[in-house]
Amino acid sequence: MAAPSEAPVTRQVSGHAAPAPVPSGPASWQPLAAAVAELPVLDASGRPVLFGELFRERRAIVVFVRHFLCYICKEYVEDLAKIPKSFLQEANVTLIVIGQSSYHHIEPFCKLTGYSHEIYVDPEREIYKRLGMKRGEEIASSGQSPHVKSNILSGSIRSLWRAVTGPLFDFQGDPAQQGGTLILGPGNNIHFIHHDRNRLDHKPINSVLQLVGVQHVDFTSRPSVIHV
């Protein structure tokens, strides 16, 4: 079960970076890391900080989600919330989620998912663009995700319900935007990039943890897939 929810560390990305293609190899990723590191982020109260500060001192797993109303993203982040902080501390690794909604949605999303690791937002999708995150879904088989509990009908209904009953009626981000996963730091180094091709193409969490030497987590103690 996830640890009790704590006040999340939250900042919002702003700025006006132009889209850029992502280089193809680790050596050429360093200028890309340096470029995104200079983009400013804001926390939930609007305080600015450079994105690069998040991975300057240690390695960071950075998960870019589609949007906070996406039921698949919600269930994926629910499993991220189950990663014990002690596991990350032992490996000297930080876990960060980036969304693309207004920062006003961050605290409700954390309460909903039980997520208490670091979380920020990029409402204008500037970092998404710089990193080459896809917009629109590629038709490709991504297999069965170990982190998705709902089917498309039940999940979509719950997402719509959250949209119409929330204090701000919006989609909490561009619904066509896809996410991805990176491993960065310390400093301006990118060690791994995965671009999601569609909403189900996120990396299994334990495969990412393995890359940074973090212990595997048992995500199986949860309800079966919900059918409607």
Curated annotation (Swiss-Prot):
Residues 1-22 are annotated as: Disordered. Pfam families: AhpC-TSA_2. CDD domains: PRX_like2 (cd02970). Residues 13-22 have a biased composition (Low complexity). GO terms for biological process: positive regulation of ERK1 and ERK2 cascade; positive regulation of glycolytic process. May positively regulate ERK1/2 signaling and AKT1 activation leading to HIF1A up-regulation with an increased expression of glycolysis genes and enhanced glycolysis. Belongs to the peroxiredoxin-like PRXL2 family. PRXL2C subfamily. This is Peroxiredoxin-like 2C.
